[in-house]
Structures are given as structure tokens and as C-alpha cells.
Swiss-Prot record:
Gene name, Swiss-Prot/TrEMBL: glgA
InterPro entries found in the cross-reference section: Glyco_trans_1, GS/SS, Starch_synth_cat_dom
Keyword field contains S-adenosyl-L-methionine: no
Organism per entry: Elusimicrobium minutum (strain Pei191)
UniProt keyword annotation of Cell cycle present: no
EC number(s) per entry: 2.4.1.21
Catalytic activity reported: [(1->4)-alpha-D-glucosyl](n) + ADP-alpha-D-glucose = [(1->4)-alpha-D-glucosyl](n+1) + ADP + H(+)
Protein name: Glycogen synthase
Length: 482
């Protein structure tokens, strides 16, 4: 099967969030299936992590943007069994960051991803690769299914090509004004509410949902939420319900080669699920020393690795920290909303030895927080899948999470009885609700037998991509057969 994955980011090449982890890991896992040929398309950003020397594809080709033409070229590497093609255009992609600066989103993100979407299809023709399935990820690739069904509908090269569109987060919809629609090259006859029109403009996310042969999202529970709850569906719940026969949820997996406490080169001490106590204690002490926290083996250490965003519920955490800082240590890592960043900076400054905040995206530090923390706090308002709770369990760090989206699919909440629990649920989304759940967890933290059970259960759960990749493989075959 000839498979194309198209995304705006993929680990280890370029990353701002969980989308990158998913696309990179999925491509790698799919390439292990017999008979699959997998190509991953990415924009060629300035700061691409070159895991190997890039090879240049000779020649260039043109991409229409409105009434003008922009030039594209290709570079590629072989990454295991995956061919990774980078779409080059210095005007659009030679920038310090992927999507935005501290001042806001790049003003021409609409054009950047029109260019990327059309360039993926033109790249396939340029290198002579006829895909059976094009798997487009999130709004940045949402125009791909639409181009296949409209502009490229009569193109013989794509006669047998089908599309799958994966929604990673309904909150990010790629909304732009009508002037952007004109730049796309779609026909104005299709500018109606049933197709492209969206509140007088265009949504790249909606375009993917409308035109893809099949649509999925990244956990079964989130698939239910975004069709039934207008707060979760962000205005598109009706559209998703109309696709109920061609819509499903497939749980994301983890790259267990990257996230492996037994062989992780980024943590100071390794450990296994059957004997994690000494290794975790050593990682905790290392983290406390590293971040200037009081070195205390007995004091619970709560870790947070997250984007500073309203979705993540971190606006409620400073109040919680102020109440618990004398009996619990906190480590927070992440960037985003400037108001939240300032709040955590102030907390750390005023509570030296008790609270640490690191305002950057740091892969090495993230690994050390997952390994060195006792508890991982994830109070999301909504969470399509979430990888952090899976990583924390794999590292023997007990999660406290909201009962939403993929968190409900992956964490088994402890009720004081069940022997299969892996963490705790926040039953009421509020500062008080978080505090109640933290109190409940701290009660069992003192019970070493019970806490050891939670650690062991979490570390032994299988979060690998094997099962999820097989579900995608089966879905591809189903789509192609229609």
C-alpha cells in the first residue's frame, strides 16, 4: 500500500506539541507493515532537526496562490523505512518558529498552508509516487482532501487515491476570511455552507471534515464528546454527526523507544517496572538538585509538563500551588499564554525551594520531570487524547487527570478498592475539585503498598503504537476498498 502522511510537524524533525509525536511515531510504525511504502511530507522549516544529511531532488515546480505562482522544491531523507520529504520555500518556511512568534501567529499562515497542501499533491506527481491513501493531519493539512475532491478530481494521477483526515484538536480550526478562499483556487460554486463557507470565511478544519473519504479523531471518548457536546465540538458537532458512518476515534500510542525508563539516555538513572523505587528516588533527588528544590525524599513532588493554555486548565493551578506549597513540591515546565507564564514565574520566585518553573520547551527536562516526579497533574478542560498521562504512567509517575477525552480512555481511576487503577480523576473541574483530588491522592501516597500498586499498574500498561497502527492500517484498507 502506498501511504502518504502530511502534517505540519513530526518528531524528531520539528515539534511544538503532541501532533509531532503522533505523526512521527505513526509513520514509523506503519512502515513496519509488510507491503507498505510510507512517505511523510513536512514543510522545510529553518530549524529542521537533521537526523541525517538531506538529499536534494533536482528541479522545481510551481504552486498557484491566488493569481500568482510560488516555487517549490524538495529535499528528503531516509528515516528507517520511511521517506521524509521536506517541501522547500524560503518565503514561507525560513522563519524562526513554525507558526508564530511571541507577538502572535504569522500573518500569512493561510497562504503558507495553502502552499503546503497543494505542494504535497504536486510533489507526489513530481516524484512519480501514486498514493493509495493520503492521511492528512489537523487543520494545517485540512485542504488536502478538499483539493483531491475538487481541483484534482479529474487528474488521472490521483484516480485511485483516497483520503483520511485526522482531527487532533477541534479548538484549532484554521479560520480565515473570504479573501483566503479566493487564494485557494477552489471554485466559487462550492462556496456554500454545505462545503467551504464558514461564517463568511473558510475553515481548513471544516474543509477536511467535509471532503475526506473518512474522518477520525485521536481517542474514542473524544469522538463521542465532539459529536454530542457543543462546547467540545466548537460549533462543528452537527457536521460531525452528519458523518457518523464515516467517523471514528482511534487512540494515539506512544513511541516506547523514546519513552522508556529502562533505556532512556536523557534521565540520570534507569529503572524497570518490577523494581522502580530506587531509580525513581534517584531521579527525584537529581531533579530537586537541578531545579533548586529542597532535597526531600518524603515530600511529594508534583510535575506538570504542558503548553500554557486555557485548554490545559493551568489558570487554576497557581491557587492550588499556594495552598499546598508547604507540604508538596511543584515543578512546572512549558510556555504559552504570557499571563500564565508570569503567574508561574512569580510563584517560583516567591517560593524558592518549593516551586520551580522553567519557561521553555525542553525535551531533556521533560523526560527528567516525568521520571523524577511522584504525581503528574493534568487538569485539562478538554483533551483529545493526551500523551503526557501515558508517559507519566510509563515512568511510574501517578497521574491526576480530568475525566475528559483520551484521559478517560487511558487512565483507570482509583476508588480505594480496584486493583487495576493507574491514577486519580478530578471529578469537579474547579480549583476546589483539583484540591479534593490532590488530597485524595496524597492520602494514598502515604500508603506505600497502594502507591506501589498504582505505579506498577501504570508502568505495565501497553501504550505502544502496535495496536493503534493496526487500526489505522485496517481503516486504510476499508477506505480504499470503497
Amino acid at each position: 500500500m502506498n501511504i502518504v502522511l502530511a502534517a505540519s510537524e513530526a518528531f524528531p524533525f520539528c515539534k511544538t506539541g503532541g501532533l509531532a509525536d503522533v505523526t512521527g511515531s505513526l509513520a514509523k510504525e506503519l512502515s513496519k507493515h509488510k507491503g507498505n511504502r510510507v512517505i511523510l511530507f513536512l514543510p522545510h522549516y529553518r530549524n529542521i532537526n537533521r537526523v541525517a544529511s538531506l538529499k536534494v531532488v533536482p528541479g522545481t515546480f510551481l504552486i498557484p496562490i491566488g493569481d500568482r505562482l510560488e516555487t517549490a522544491s524538495l529535499s528528503y531523507i531516509s528515516w528507517g523505512n520511511v521517506l521524509v520529504f521536506f517541501i522547500n520555500n524560503t518565503k514561507y518556511f525560513d522563519r524562526p518558529e513554525l507558526y508564530r512568534t511571541a507577538a502572535g501567529d504569522y500573518f500569512d499562515n493561510d497562504e503558507r498552508f495553502i502552499f503546503f497542501n497543494r505542494a504535497v499533491l504536486e510533489s507526489c506527481k513530481f516524484i512519480g509516487y501514486r498514493p493509495d491513501i493520503i492521511h492528512a493531519h489537523d487543520w494545517q493539512a485540512g485542504l488536502l482532501p478538499a483539493y483531491l475532491k475538487t481541483v484534482y478530481k479529474t487528474d488521472a494521477f490521483f484516480t485511485r487515491t483516497r483520503s483520511l483526515f485526522t482531527i487532533h484538536n477541534m479548538a484549532y480550526q484554521g479560520q480565515y476570511p473570504y479573501s483566503t478562499f479566493i487564494k485557494t483556487g477552489f471554485h466559487t460554486v462550492d462556496y456554500v455552507p454545505e462545503r467551504f463557507e464558514y461564517y463568511g470565511g473558510i475553515s481548513y478544519l471544516k474543509s477536511g471534515i467535509v471532503y475526506a473519504d473518512y474522518v477520525n479523531t485521536v481517542s474514542p471518548n473524544y469522538a463521542k464528546e465532539i459529536t454530542l457536546d457543543e462546547k467540545m465540538g466548537f460549533g462543528m458537532e452537527g457536521l460531525l454527526r452528519s458523518r457518523q458512518d464515516t467517523f471514528c476515534g482511534i487512540l494515539n500510542g506512544l513511541d516506547t523507544g523514546v519513552w522508556d525508563p529502562e533505556h532512556d539516555p536523557l534521565i540520570p538513572y534507569s529503572y524497570e517496572s518490577f523494581s522502580p523505587v530506587k531509580g525513581k528516588a534517584a531521579c527525584k533527588q537529581f531533579l530537586q538538585n537541578m531545579l533548586g528544590l529542597e532535597v526531600s525524599p518524603s515530600k511529594p513532588l508534583v510535575g506538570i509538563v504542558s503548553r500554557m493554555d486555557y485548554q490545559k486548565g493551568l489558570d487554576l493551578i497557581p491557587g492550588v500551588v499556594n495552598k499546598y506549597k508547604d507540604k508538596v513540591q511543584f515543578v512546572v515546565v512549558g510556555t504559552g499564554d504570557s499571563g500564565m507564564e508570569k503567574a508561574f514565574m512569580a510563584l517560583a520566585k516567591n517560593n524558592v525551594g518549593k516551586v520551580a518553573y522553567v519557561a521553555k520547551v525542553d525535551e531533556e527536562l521533560a523526560h527528567r520531570v516525568y521520571a523524577g516526579s511522584d504525581i503528574f497533574l493534568m487538569p485539562s478542560r478538554f483533551e483529545p487524547c493526551g500523551l503526557s498521562q501515558m508517559i507519566s504512567m510509563r515512568y511510574g509517575t501517578v497521574p491526576i487527570v480530568s475525566r475528559v477525552g483520551g484521559l478517560l480512555d487511558t487512565v483507570k481511576g482509583y476508588d480505594g478498592i480496584t486493583k487495576y487503577a493507574t491514577g486519580f480523576f478530578i471529578l469537579e473541574f474547579s480549583e476546589t475539585g483539583i484540591e479534593r483530588s490532590l488530597d485524595y491522592a496524597l492520602k494514598y501516597y502515604q500508603d506505600k503498598r497502594c502507591w506501589g500498586m498504582l505505579i506498577k499498574n501504570g508502568m505495565e500498561k501497553d501504550f505502544s503504537w502496535t495496536k493503534s497502527a493496526q487500526e489505522y492500517q485496517d481503516l486504510y484498507k476499508k477506505i480504499i476498498s470503497k
